[in-house]
Design a protein with these regions (language model features):
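Cytoplasmic helix-loop-helix junction between adjacent transmembrane helices
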Residues: 124-161
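Conserved MFS/SLC helix-loop-helix module at the cytosolic interface between two early adjacent transmembrane helices
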Residues: 80-119
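C-terminal transmembrane helical hairpin of 12-TM major facilitator-type secondary transporters
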Residues: 320-369
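Glycine-rich segments within core transmembrane alpha-helices of 12-TM secondary carriers
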Residues: 154-175, 198-199, 387-397
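Interfacial helix-cap and linker-helix signal at transmembrane-aqueous boundaries
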Residues: 56-57, 88-89, 173-183, 281-282, ...
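Helix-breaking motifs and short loop linkers at transmembrane-helix boundaries and internal kinks
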Residues: 61, 93, 114-120, 131, ...
Length: 445
């Protein structure tokens, strides 16, 4: 009798495990390719200005400081509206809000193709930030609605892998468009116009394709849907035994402050690199715009491989700290080498491309840290808090690089600045004790 009971229990557990495997696989196949597509469109629209700048600043008479400030203007409104938008995703509808985001940013991107003055450029970037705000934290929150903790890092890695994948598409496309001249419009203008249209189209599709939560998923079989809902509810109950911190409590916790500062510095370097790397390669090498865009396939490939391998290995070993810090330190070392070997053109180009590729690998493992330690209700606002302060690095980094370029008439100071922020960010992550709950306190009696 006892053996039969144990055997029946074991069989039931095996069947339940099989249902769980099917549910996890079906969700991944349904959601991740579409999320990947959304982020490719997002990344293309966000960084096409870096390729456009190979011609735009010269055509419009912009200095490096004007370009850097214009790029940074995006992050002012992005930060202002990010937290409210992320909370809307949590409390209202990811499907409707993300569709709205994509359609509006596509329209603003198209209009950017018609700017003529610095003021118009600033305004276009300012409104693009407002349109796009909350897309990233909203997508992170959306993934927490569908993926269990053990799968989340790989899901986020898939999201971030769209960045270098988009560069693989965007670099040669930009190289071709920069050489066209249609309807009295130069190529950099067509770059904005033609890359804004897909956002409007895909945003419309998003409204009909996405499902907000598993309980609403008619495409999941009943047993798989029930398993996934229960699994996520069990995780939620465990997390909700911890009290969510207030904003003031978060700022009093040294670990949270360290995490916020590390992300701010990492994005100061990363966003500075992303928006300036075509200009850096052009000025270091003197090659054509088309060759620049082809060279930029190298960091995209390195970044794609590094991000997926790092995210996979981080999940396999259940280790986050080193998997986040090492890519930052590696990128910093490459930019430090640039300050020493800038006049050796082959060494400089290799260091620049490697450093730009390494920076992608830390993203998914960084975001796996807070997602494992926060309750779902607090996740939207907390992601927004960390990401909002971090995104200010986009303003700080791009304006500082433009200022240093204009002030010194050299790239050396900018390379040193980027190296410094990467190294400090990496060391802050190394100093972080992530085995203890971050930003949460035991529930009081």
């Amino acid at each position: 009798m006892s053996m039969n009971l144990h055997g029946s229990a074991g069989l039931a557990m095996a069947e339940l495990s099989a249902v769980g495997q099917r549910a996890r696989r079906r969700v991944a196949y349904r959601l991740l390719p579409f999320v990947f597509l959304l982020y490719i469109v997002n990344y293309l629209d966000r960084v096409n200005v870096s390729f456009a700048n190979l011609r735009m600043s010269a055509d419009l008479g912009f200095s490096d400081r004007v370009y850097g400030l214009g790029v940074g203007m995006f992050y002012i409104t992005y930060v202002l509206f990010e937290i409210p938008g992320a909370v809307i995703v949590e409390r209202w509808s990811a499907r409707k809000w993300i569709a709205r985001i994509m359609i509006s940013w596509g329209i603003v991107t198209i209009l950017t193709g018609f700017v003529h003055t610095a003021t118009q450029f600033y305004a276009a970037r300012f409104f693009l930030g407002a349109a796009e705000s909350s897309f990233f934290p909203g997508m992170i929150v959306y993934l927490t609605h569908w993926f269990c903790a053990r799968d989340r890092s790989r899901a986020i890695a898939c999201l971030y892998a769209a960045n270098p994948a988009a560069a693989l598409i965007g670099s040669p496309l930009a190289g071709w468009l920069l050489g066209v001249h249609w309807l009295s419009l130069t190529g950099w203008r067509w770059l904005f116009i033609l890359e804004g249209i897909p956002a409007v189209v895909v945003g419309t599709i998003t409204y009909f394709y996405m499902t907000d939560r598993p309980v609403q998923a008619s495409w999941l079989p009943h047993d798989e849907r029930d398993w996934l809902v229960k699994e996520l509810q069990d995780e939620l109950k465990a997390k909700n035994k911890l009290r969510n911190p207030t904003i003031l409590e978060a700022f009093r916790d040294a670990r949270i402050l360290r995490l916020i500062l590390a992300y701010f510095l990492a994005l100061t370097g990363a966003l500075g690199t992303i928006y300036w790397i075509p200009t850096f390669v052009k000025r270091l090498s003197g090659v054509s715009n088309q060759t620049v865009t082809l060279l930029l396939l190298v960091p995209a490939l390195i970044g794609l491989a590094g991000m997926l391998i790092n995210g996979w290995h981080s999940d396999k070993t259940a280790e986050r700290r080193l998997h986040t810090a090492i890519p930052l330190l590696a990128a910093g070392s490459m930019f430090a080498l640039l300050t020493l070997g800038r006049h050796n053109m082959p060494l400089a180009i290799v260091s620049l491309l490697l450093g730009s590729g390494f920076l992608y690998a830390y993203y998914p493992t960084f975001w796996a840290i807070p997602t494992m330690m926060l309750s779902e209700a607090a996740a939207a606002a907390t992601f927004g808090l960390i990401n909002s302060i971090g995104q200010l690095g986009g303003l700080a980094g791009n304006y500082t690089i433009g200022y240093l370029n204009d002030r010194t008439h050299s790239l050396t100071a900018s390379f040193a600045f980027i190296a410094l922020v990467y190294v400090v960010a990496g060391n802050l992550i190394l100093s972080l004790r992530i085995r203890d709950p971050i930003g949460v306190l035991p529930r009081s009696n």
